[in-house]
Amino acid sequence: YLGGSICREKVTCTGLSVTILDSTVNRFVTRADVEKFLNKEYGNYIGQHIDSIDLCKVEKIIDSRSAVYKSEAFTTRDGKLNVTVTQRTPVVRFQKSDGGFYADAEGYLFPLQSSYASRVQIIDGEIPLKANSGYKGTVTDPHEQAWLNKVLGVVNYMEDSKVWKDKIVQITVCE
């Protein structure tokens, strides 16, 4: 007992509290998903002393998910492991014959999610990106990066224009 409060090293984890900051915009990740990821890859954290929970490991587990932009983990004196998640915000969806993927405004590619489809511009046809449907990360080829940057510029222009945003929902790329 120290200064009117229980010493942190005596407090055990009693549960998980998950906050998805942008859940009204995107629904790629849920509380149940975060709990499942942690149970599978971290192991049992309930009952552990809160000071012994590896918060960096918790964040790495959550951040490794393709639709997660960033997470923050912390514990509180009431024994809760708190995880705050910010999801990636896609601006365009690429649909190829072997599947598809999203790109965010920075050009980060990530797979389509089975649980949720974001309402963004769709581009199909002859897409000159070698990324397959399960790929996550940035484009490394300079020609592919230049093409992707042009596409993102067009999509941003359409999003900023009330006329184009309401009239175009899909773009087909021809050779």
Where do the language-model regions lie?
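Charged, solvent-exposed interaction patches on well-folded alpha/beta domains
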Residues: 1-22, 27-33, 40-49, 53-175
